[in-house]
């Protein structure tokens, strides 16, 4: 236990020597200028909610687009016919 007491005495001495020329008010001003932990957590939660909403909107848009494409896409036969006489391509096809 004597080693612990020695260590604590030495630590107190080193701490007191290191803090002699420290300007405590400037440190407190720097700490008070930083946002509180609650503010940081709220910002992170808001950013996460915005990202989740954007991703959900993107997925919903893709799903609705897919459903609309399937519903509106009606297969129609493609007929191959000769071009009309008024078409310039009609001159290329001989009779």
From Swiss-Prot:
Protein name as catalogued: Nickel and cobalt resistance protein CnrY
Transmembrane regions: 46-68
Periplasmic compartment residues: 69-95
Any single Pfam family the record assigns to this protein: CnrY
Coiled coil, from the record: none
Molecular function, one GO term: molecular function inhibitor activity
Topological relation to the membrane, as annotated: Single-pass membrane protein
Superkingdom to which the source organism belongs: Bacteria
Family statement: To A.xylosoxydans NccY.
Subcellular location(s) per record: Cell inner membrane
Induction per the UniProt record: By nickel and cobalt.
Function field: Nickel and cobalt resistance proteins CnrA, CnrB, CnrC CnrH and CnrR may be involved in the regulation of CNR.
Keywords from the named record: Cell inner membrane, Cell membrane, Cobalt, Membrane, Nickel, Plasmid, Transmembrane, Transmembrane helix
Disulfide bonds: none
Cytoplasmic side: 1-45
InterPro entries the record matches: CnrY
Gene Ontology terms: cellular component: plasma membrane
């Amino acid at each position: 236990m004597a080693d612990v007491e020695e260590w604590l005495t030495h630590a107190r001495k080193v701490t007191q020597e290191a803090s002699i020329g420290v300007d405590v008010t400037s440190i407190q001003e720097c700490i008070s200028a930083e946002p509180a932990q609650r503010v940081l957590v709220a910002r992170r939660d808001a950013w996460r909610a915005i990202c989740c909403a954007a991703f959900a909107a993107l997925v919903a848009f893709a799903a609705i687009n897919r459903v609309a494409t399937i519903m509106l896409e009606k297969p129609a036969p493609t007929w191959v016919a000769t071009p009309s006489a008024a078409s310039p391509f009609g001159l290329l096809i001989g009779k």
